[in-house]
Amino acid sequence: MSVIKKDQTREQYDRSKIQGGILRACYKRPIPVEKIESLMDSIEGDIFDTADKEISSTRIGEIVMEHLKDLDAVAYVRFASVYR
């Protein structure tokens, strides 16, 4: 799957980029690693369910924020402040 970036360039989907953003947002929060892994799996499932061959980085960010909002308010705000 390809990700369409804001400058319209394309690159291969990379789970580690999303995971890095989530880990930074959850830094020093009382969230077990298992919960973060489960969150990643859910996010990835949504990404692959909503897109065929391409998805915009903006849409990926929206999906991540939807999931983080339910997990932890502080992590959500951290991610949103960097993402926007």
Model regions and ranges:
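C-terminal binding/interaction regions
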Residues: 81
